[in-house]
Amino acid sequence: MSEQHSLNPFESGSVTASDVAAAKSGAEDLVNTLTAHTVHPSTELPSATSFPSALPNSENPVIQNISSSSSEPHHTSQSTPGETSSPVCPVSGAHGGADKKCPALEAGCPFTNTTKQNVDPEISNALWSVLTWKNTSCSFSTLMSILALVYVPSWINLPRLFFRTFRYVFLITSIIEFGGLFASNGKRGVLSHFRSSYITCDSKALDRIVNSIVDIFNVMLIQFQRILFAESPILTFTASVAAFIEFFLSGFLSYKSLFVWNVLFAFILPRLYVCNERSIKHLVASLERSGDKLKKQATETINTTVNK
């Protein structure tokens, strides 16, 4: 251990040449230390334990603690709220902000796991009204719009029609504007003064449209899960028959034709069900009674066999 010398100028005692040299060397060491430990605005001032001591860095526990705490940041469950508050994907079980495995990445998974049907009932009623033709004009326009979206792009080259139309529009407007500038000696055009404001998209209206589409998709997704888990066995059996028919049609129909057939079935079968609802319910009730009778007879047969 080297001899320690005080740097306090107000301390009493005799001053020798060795004391002056030691004080000078200590002052130089202090200046070098302060220069090495530059203080940034975002950091705290160094404490007294950060200055040089008699022990080297490898043997000084204070310096070891400081270096370890600066090189290895401490994270706790409270310091990372994004990992706990981010939605968990029910498909992959991953956090949107931590695992980066969901399709929506930081936004989380687009699917939620819930026990309630969080869908506006008006959307379900409106969709059923369209499919059952309660409003004929709305159902007809919806069906024609879907068929037009399927067949019009195959009949008409829409990009070519778009550019062929606007090449004449842009040419005519530029000629008219140049003519107005030429007639007024470059002071005033013709068409450039007609526009009073710019037309932009309303984000709120787009959000409402997207939300309506998502609600319709959720209705179909919920109905598919009800069929899949046999909440209504008759409906599940009907869906299996429809799937068999679709499997048969997919053997010789193209994707477009198969899609059109599905759309037509979606607009025809619900209407047939509504028109024949009483007879269908009577048939279902008779089938249930027959099933109960067969179940009762089978139970009685098993009981008599066991008793013998």
From Swiss-Prot:
Low complexity bias (residue ranges) = 67-81
Molecular functions (GO terms): membrane bending activity; sphingolipid binding
Domain named Reticulon is located at: 127-308
Q: Which residues are glycosylated?
A: N65, N113, N135, N303
Q: Name one GO cellular component term.
A: endoplasmic reticulum tubular network membrane
Q: Which PROSITE patterns match?
A: RETICULON
Q: Name one Pfam family in it.
A: Reticulon
Presence of keyword Transmembrane helix? yes
Per the record, the domain of life is Eukaryota
Bias (Polar residues) ranges: 1-17, 41-66
Broad class of where this protein is predominantly found: endoplasmic reticulum
Its membrane topology, per UniProt? Answer: Multi-pass membrane protein
Q: One GO biological process from the UniProt record?
A: cell division
The segments labelled Disordered in the record are 1-22, 41-92
Role, per record: Required for the correct positioning of the cellular division plane by delimiting the actomyosin ring assembly at the cell equator. Overexpression causes cell lysis.
Q: Its quaternary structure?
A: Interacts with TTS1 and YOP1.
Q: What is this protein called?
A: Reticulon-like protein 1
